[in-house]
Design a protein with these regions (language model features):
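Short, catalytically relevant binding-site loops at active-site mouths
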Residues: 110-112, 162-163, 181
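A short SAM/SAH-binding and catalytic strip from SAM-dependent methyltransferases
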Residues: 172-182
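A short acidic, Gly/Pro-enriched loop at the edge of an enzyme's catalytic core
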Residues: 165-173
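Conserved glycine-centered beta->alpha loop in an early N-terminal alpha/beta scaffold
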Residues: 78
């Protein structure tokens, strides 16, 4: 993990139960910090600053600082490391809004929880959220849903070309993310 990130948590297999029977994305790690999906030869987030990339493309690009409100629904193609979700929840909490946001993500190649946590060590801005979700990623991947006081997160595993057909919820915003060519 990043040696200069003093808030980095130790990721252990005891805390993050591995998933079985799923499509492993087979990762390479650039500088032991940035996950790259071998199948697509593409990093999961910007090599320069993934958090700033998410803020620019998704949060600011969708004007979410003005649009997020109680009951706001976001859907996403590609959960990846959870960076888009954590960044959205970060913005929601920065706004000190009352109520709840609803976030649904479709993922064909889910990362192991231990891989998600390793990748999240790159983002000191999200360290409190990373710590909060540390023990919950395994539960999300097993159950498909997490719910807290200010969010509901739903993860739908499988190829979105098939799984999205059962998704009949209207949303306020889509995050269309993916590997090159996206």
């Amino acid at each position: 993990f990043s040696p200069d990130n003093n808030r980095a948590i130790e990721v252990t297999k005891e805390k993050c139960k591995p998933l079985k029977n799923y499509n492993n994305p087979k990762l390479l790690w650039r500088d032991d910090r940035i996950p790259i999906a071998q199948k697509f030869d593409d990093p999961y987030f910007s090599l320069d600053n993934g958090f700033e990339e998410v803020r620019h493309v998704f949060l600011n690009g969708n004007k979410l600082s003005n649009r997020l409100n109680n009951g706001f629904k976001i859907a996403e193609l590609g959960f990846g490391t959870g960076l888009n979700f954590l960044s959205t929840l970060w913005l929601w909490r920065q706004k000190k809004q009352k109520g709840k946001i609803f976030y649904t993500s479709f993922e064909a190649f889910p990362l192991q929880p231990i891989e998600m946590l390793k990748a999240q060590n790159e983002f000191p801005e999200l360290s409190d959220l990373k710590d909060e979700f540390y023990s919950l990623w395994s539960k999300l991947l097993e159950k498909g849903e997490l719910s807290g006081n200010d969010y509901t997160l739903r993860l739908i595993l499988g190829d979105a070309r098939r799984t999205i057909k059962q998704f009949d919820t209207q949303v306020d915003c889509w995050f269309l993310d993916g590997f090159s060519p996206a």
